[in-house]
Amino acid sequence: MKKRALVSVSDKTGVVEFVKGLLEQGIEVISTGGTKKLLEENGLQVIGISEVTGFPEIMDGRVKTLHPNIHGGLLAVRDNETHVAQMNELGMEPIDFVIVNLYPFKETIAKPDVTFADAIENIDIGGPTMIRSAAKNHKFVSVIVDPVDYDVVLAELKENGEVKEETKRKLAAKVFRHTAAYDALISNYLTEQMGEESPETLTVTFEKKQDLRYGENPHQKATFYKAPFTVTSSVAYAEQLHGKELSYNNINDADAALSIVKEFTEPAVVAVKHMNPCGVGVGTDIHEAYTRAYEADPVSIFGGIIAANREIDKATAEKLHEIFLEIIIAPSFSKEALEVLQSKKNLRLLTVNIEKATSASKKLTSVQGGLLVQEEDTLSLDESTISIPTKREPSEQEWKDLKLAWKVVKHVKSNAIVLAKDDMTIGVGAGQMNRVGSAKIAITQAGEKAQGSALASDAFFPMPDTVEEAAKAGITAIIQPGGSIRDEDSIKVADTYGIAMVFTGVRHFKH
């Protein structure tokens, strides 16, 4: 019996050449709608779906393949005598190949002017039903949903006269990944439209961007996936202009650097190592900002990741060229800057839009046996809700330093302490199990610069010891959430040493 293929695709990439190959192998081709028209325009002989079903396409194409003659031909187990007898009795013929991809739902809802009705109309029903039927019966049916697989199937047909069982199984697995991702997009769109924030089930879908050489360590395998919709201000959708492929650790560090630099509207540069900032500087231009970020910690910046929120110019590029860096991220690079930096063949240069995340963005964190979902921490300092419990208020310069330190401390691993002075960080204490330990690290790093600086803490002081350490170092202003049952003890110490302290009422833990 002559083999048959059913072809109905929205992505018509390579389909004409593929169908030519099928016809050359003596395979009969059934097709529908626009696909049939395209194939016939290219001189290919195909059978209309209505000739198989004996029923016209109706309801604007909503009903065309949902028919027993189609699904019987797909689902029949060819070595089951009962199935074969029923097919013969009902005049059905088997379908051996299904080449289908689905209505462009993702592309439709990505349009800024999409209406709800447009989105609903682009939910495919017949396509998923066909490819699921074919994939279930993959022992007998080859199902192709991705044009990238056309050459593999044709090569095996030419060599063996049939598709290998292993290939059929791989194609079937791909089908169910394809339909799962498709349904996830639909369910997430409808869930968002209804404003449901915590649905009873959560289905997420990501698309493979690249295999990575290894994960956090060489013995760990890793892959990088991207969100299905373009997130312009992200590492996943950044454009790499130069350098080696990104590694797992590169991606994590670049993401951290990008998150911090988004906090600033003035020219700013952030240096990151192991997902913690080692230096942050702001200035009247990007060169001045970089100089301050470098001076914040000229030791730790070596081998680090740099993020800037302005174009990198030649003067800044020449300074960056002087040290070893893994990555530089910026909205753009001047032509002269690129010439300077591209002389380092391994230095990765990325361009990305710098846009602050919104609270609607979700952060996913995997735990053993589960997944945590929360809003991104995008809350900025609200000066209308702060309080100053100390006798002295911050000076104008102290306010500048406090604000800078507060923007940075929310991005430092808890327990987190950041010291800032004169438009730059001068000390960062990260990830300690007690708060005073982080304070001591930041103060030690700052050295003499701590005198007259501002301190930010990501959470309240459970005891006054951190304020005492700050006073010893000559720190003159502190910003922290407040809310401890022992706040009065910290306030008393601050007043004793003339330290101005600000309560924000907002905690910024980061784990």
Curated annotation (Swiss-Prot):
The IMP cyclohydrolase activity resides in the N-terminal region. Keywords: Hydrolase, Multifunctional enzyme, Purine biosynthesis, Transferase. This is Bifunctional purine biosynthesis protein PurH. It catalyses: (6R)-10-formyltetrahydrofolate + 5-amino-1-(5-phospho-beta-D-ribosyl)imidazole-4-carboxamide = 5-formamido-1-(5-phospho-D-ribosyl)imidazole-4-carboxamide + (6S)-5,6,7,8-tetrahydrofolate; IMP + H2O = 5-formamido-1-(5-phospho-D-ribosyl)imidazole-4-carboxamide. One of its GO terms (biological process) is 'de novo' IMP biosynthetic process. The gene is purH. SMART domains: AICARFT_IMPCHas (SM00798), MGS (SM00851). GO terms for molecular function: IMP cyclohydrolase activity; phosphoribosylaminoimidazolecarboxamide formyltransferase activity. It holds the Pfam family MGS. Belongs to the PurH family. It comes from the Bacteria. Pathway: Purine metabolism; IMP biosynthesis via de novo pathway; 5-formamido-1-(5-phospho-D-ribosyl)imidazole-4-carboxamide from 5-amino-1-(5-phospho-D-ribosyl)imidazole-4-carboxamide (10-formyl THF route): step 1/1; Purine metabolism; IMP biosynthesis via de novo pathway; IMP from 5-formamido-1-(5-phospho-D-ribosyl)imidazole-4-carboxamide: step 1/1. Its EC number is 2.1.2.3, 3.5.4.10. PROSITE patterns: MGS. CDD domains: IMPCH. Gene3D superfamilies: 3.40.140.20, Methylglyoxal synthase-like domain.
